[in-house]
């Protein structure tokens, strides 16, 4: 015995869902049924002058079978089609949705059906409908990840179309700031890209040994930290960039301090020490420059550490 679902028994219902409801089609159906006068095929034409059937009775003879689905059945079909990725079929199913009388309100509130409509709107480029669905219906946390990704990607695509070029990381950051996630698909928790202290400590240890790890070392470190190789590579890349920037800043500060110290000592009539200073504390030009340089190195070394480690690693 071959089992067939109700959808397979009456496929024509999906192609003509509103055929009988259209006034033009209704008149065609009534006309094709005849009025019963002068036609031996009419069921009311027997015995002379029989009464013709009422219009709704004539119409019922030509109507296609009506299928009634509960919201749970519709949601089950939507979930299956969404999981399989058959977006085109999912869209056709939602467009020609046969529902039981009085079930429209429940259909419009069911999360699986609303999520399916959002998926179809996203894949068809109908971003206005997508935003309307996501902003006006509260979704559970299980659906947040997928819906957040669609929200952001839709805004990215609109921004790319408007600017006529692909978006970079900074552009995407600005888009996210301009179009924050609605609270209907977001629990309010701020996402952090900072790693745990244990992970950061392990990454720093490996960085001191080798700032340029090869792919095999990245995979090994990823397993040790629970990160992905891409995250490990990004952390090393960002750390190298911060260290280079800190080193360049240190060099500039050294040069500026050295030049200012030499200019102050070279000025005529400039005392090498104040009258309040004792001879033992009076410093020669060489001593003054060296002390200034030493103080600069101390300050900049602190700056280098804070600039490298105070930021979040992504």
UniProtKB/Swiss-Prot annotation:
Single Gene Ontology MF annotation: DNA-binding transcription activator activity, RNA polymerase II-specific
GO CC terms in record: nucleus; transcription regulator complex
Chain segments carrying region Disordered: 214-233, 240-314
Residues in the DNA-binding region annotation: 188-247
InterPro entries named in the record: HD, Homeodomain-like_sf, SIX1_SD
Name of one Pfam family that matches: Homeodomain
Places the protein is found: Nucleus
Keyword annotations from UniProtKB, A to Z: Developmental protein, DNA-binding, Homeobox, Nucleus, Repressor, Transcription, Transcription regulation
Membrane spanning stretches: none
Biased composition (Polar residues): 298-314
Keyword rRNA-binding: no
Keyword Repressor: yes
Domain of life of the organism encoding this protein: Eukaryota
Low complexity compositional bias, start-end: 271-293
Coarse class of the protein's main subcellular location: nucleus
UniProt GO BP: apoptotic process involved in development; brain development; cell proliferation in forebrain; epithelial cell maturation; eye development; forebrain dorsal/ventral pattern formation; lens development in camera-type eye; lens fiber cell apoptotic process
Functional description taken from the UniProt entry: Transcriptional regulator which can act as both a transcriptional repressor and activator by binding a ATTA homeodomain core recognition sequence on these target genes. During forebrain development represses WNT1 expression allowing zona limitans intrathalamica formation and thereby ensuring proper anterio-posterior patterning of the diencephalon and formation of the rostral diencephalon. Acts as a direct upstream activator of SHH expression in the rostral diencephalon ventral midline and that in turn SHH maintains its expression.
PANTHER family in the record: HOMEOBOX PROTEIN SIX, HOMEOBOX PROTEIN SIX3
Similarity annotation: Belongs to the SIX/Sine oculis homeobox family.
Protein name, per record: Homeobox protein SIX3
Organism from which the protein derives: Gallus gallus (Chicken)
Source organism phylogeny: Eukaryota, Metazoa, Chordata, Craniata, Vertebrata
């Amino acid at each position: 015995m071959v089992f067939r679902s109700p959808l397979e028994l009456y496929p024509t219902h999906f192609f003509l869902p509103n055929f009988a409801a259209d006034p033009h089609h209704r008149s065609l159906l009534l006309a094709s049924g005849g009025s019963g006068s002068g036609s031996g095929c009419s069921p009311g034409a027997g015995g002379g002058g029989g009464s013709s059937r009422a219009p709704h009775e004539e119409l019922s003879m030509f109507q296609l079978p009506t299928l009634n689905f509960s919201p749970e059945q519709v949601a089950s079909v939507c979930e299956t089609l969404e999981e399989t990725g058959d977006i085109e079929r999912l869209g056709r199913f939602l467009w020609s949705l046969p529902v039981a009388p009085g079930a429209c309100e429940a259909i419009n509130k069911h999360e699986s059906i609303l999520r399916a409509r959002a998926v179809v709107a996203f894949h068809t480029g109908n971003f206005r409908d997508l935003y309307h669905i996501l902003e006006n219906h509260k979704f559970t946390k299980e659906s947040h990840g997928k819906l957040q990704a669609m929200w952001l990607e839709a805004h990215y695509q609109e921004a790319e179309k408007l600017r006529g070029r692909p978006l970079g990381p900074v552009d995407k950051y600005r888009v996210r700031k301009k179009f924050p996630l609605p609270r209907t698909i977001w629990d309010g928790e701020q996402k952090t890209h900072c790693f745990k202290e244990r992970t950061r400590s392990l990454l720093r240890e490996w960085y001191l040994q080798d700032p340029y790890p090869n792919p095999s070392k990245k995979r090994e470190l990823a397993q040790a930290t629970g990160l992905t190789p891409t995250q490990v590579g990004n952390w090393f890349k960002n750390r190298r960039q911060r260290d280079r920037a800190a080193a360049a800043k240190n060099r500039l500060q050294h040069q500026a301090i050295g030049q200012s110290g030499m200019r102050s000592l070279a000025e005529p009539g400039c005392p090498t020490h104040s009258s309040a200073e004792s001879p033992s504390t009076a410093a020669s030009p060489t001593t003054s420059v060296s002390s200034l340089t030493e103080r600069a190195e101390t300050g900049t070394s602190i700056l280098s550490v804070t600039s490298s480690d105070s930021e979040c690693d992504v």
